[in-house]
Structures are given as structure tokens and as C-alpha cells.
Amino acid sequence: MRGISLWVCGPGRRAANADRTGKGISVLPTSYDLVLAYAHDYFSSRVRELCGQFDLSFFLVEPIWATEFVHKLQAGEVKVRVLIDMASDAYLPDDPYFTLAKTVKQLGGYVIDDPDAGAMMGDKSKFHRLLVDHNIPVPETVIVTRSDLDSFCLTEAMLAQVGLPFVVKPGWGSGRQGVILDGQSEADLRQSAAAVPYSDAFLLQRKITPKSLEGRVAWFRVFHIFGEVIPCWWHPTTGDYQLVTPLEERRFKLQPLTRIMKDIARVSKIHFFSSEITLTAEKRFFVIDYLNTECDMSAKSFWPSGVPDELARHVAWVLVDHAMAVAKRRRGPFDDELMQRDQDWLERQRQSGQAPRE
């Protein structure tokens, strides 16, 4: 195994190179202003570039050395001021990125987003009840616990509530694992339970049919990032993204997307996430996929189903800008630091006889 070469942006810009003995990381700065838990090249390169511009030390934790970085962090050899978590999976108990996020938080670092809040909101059955309590529009749902699976029987009242066919979703799980879109009976529920053995609850939901808006499916993936809401057209089958323009938002009366996303952010306490929301022929909005905390920022120029490039660039900017405010504050007052730099420069100029005249 060859050593790993790590490049650092920011103060004291230097290469932190691994030795060539196969022992992995051998030289690391004491502290990083910003650490990015793995993202695709386009997005991570943009974050790295911005860190260089803002004078922030930066490290990208790629999968090959995620576990080793956690060990260095736990041993006190590395410190992290801000972690942007784009990769952790709370549904996997041994996921190194989730361990990284929890370790950074435990050691006093700032994590975007809080791993404990993300894990708590990741339980769809519990989060569903929370959304209902706060009047956030979600499909009609019947929640079934795993302990009730053997005795569970769909009643006429339940079928009247969720309709046929209905959607089956595991309460705990990521991606589409265990999701059944054309459920007909208890057998589909048990099939979902077998596919996701670690989920303790399951949701039977009314299947929502989106309306068409001038040939476009009224299905949206909407991003929330520190109070800013960015809606996108998103096709649930092809995964194709297009930004919703201000004109389209006014023309199709899509303003409720912003209100719904801000309500979800308020309830969940999560800063950076996406949700799937659809609009029906009855002009009703429904949140379909409640909360995705590890947003995929793969760019459309590289991946057909990726997000628009301008969205990826903007998200990188907002995240780094927020991280800079936190990192500079933890270094010391930002204005005082700038003032000291100016004084140091003036003193050097005076000593060289080139000080500006007053």
C-alpha cells in the first residue's frame, strides 16, 4: 500500500504527506478549520477552492482513510473546528463517517449538521407524528410496529384511509430499500419488513399522484440551507433536476414550498437538508420524502441525474461562508486578527524605511 498524500489549503499551506512505509498519515497540522466528509469531486473541489480564498485550512476525508482519520482525532493528533458532514449514514451503526461526526461533536467541534439531531429525525415513524402535530402536510398514514407484524390485519377503515394501492416505507432506513410503491395487502408489509430487518416500524401511506404543470410533473426536491430555500423540479423516475425560476414560482403559485421547508427546519432543528414535495390536481401540497440530511451534490455536468451546477456551487459557498464564521470565531475575534495583521505589516514597513507617510 502506498502512502497517502494530503494537501492542505489555508494558513501555513503545506503538503501533509504520508510516509512510504505503508503506515498511512504521518504528518498532519494540529488543527483544521474545515473538514469535509466525502463529497463528489466537483463539489469538494469548489469547497477546497473557497477555503483557499478565505484562508481556511482544509481536509477532505475520503473513504480510503475515513477510519484512520477518526483514530487520529480520537488520539488527539488532529483537531477539527468545523465538519461539513456529507457522507454519514446513521442507519449503519459502524459507519466511520457517522463515528467521525459524533467524535467531532464530542470533542467540541461544530458539525453541519448535528449527528444526534439527524439520527433522531431519521426515524420516519416518529418524525411523521411530529410533522402531523405541527400541521405540515403529509400523506394519510398507518404506522405499524414490528412487534405487531404477525397479528396485523388491514381493516376497511385503514384501506379507506390509505387507499389501494398504497406505499410501504420502513421507518428506519435510507434510499429505496424496503420501499414498495404498489402495496396491496399485509404481504407487502411483511416483504418490506424482511428487506429491512433493523427497522422497528413501517409506514403504510396513501399514494399521491402529482398533477402536470404544462407538461412537467409537479414533483419537487427542495433544498434548505441555513434559512435559504431552493426549490427544484425533480422527476421521481428519471431523477432529472431543474431549478425552479422565480417566474415559475409565481406563475404556478409554488410559494408554499418555502413555507413548508422552513416549517420542517424549525421542527427538525436541521440546517442543511432536502425534502420531496408534490402538488396534486386538487392544488394540495404533500411532503413525500421528509428529510434527507446528506444531500447528494453530484453536479449535472458530470452526472445526468445530478443537481444543477449552479446549485452545487451556491451550496458550497453558503456552507464555507458559515464554516468560516464559526472557525474564525474559534480562532479568536476575526476583526482583532485582521487588525493585528495590519499592525504587523505597518511595523515591517517602518523597519524597512518604507512606511507610508501620514
Locations of regions flagged by a protein language model:
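ATP-grasp fold ATP-binding core
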Residues: 131-132, 158-177, 199-214
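Phosphate-binding site of ATP-dependent enzymes
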Residues: 181-268
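Glycine-rich phosphate-binding loop of ATP-grasp-fold ATP-dependent ligases
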Residues: 141, 166-192
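A short glycine-rich, hydrophobically flanked beta-strand micro-motif that places a catalytic Asp/Glu
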Residues: 270-282
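Conserved N-proximal alpha/beta basic substrate-recognition cap immediately N-terminal to
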Residues: 39-149
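C-terminal active-site "lid" helix and adjoining low-complexity regulatory extension at the edge
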Residues: 279-358
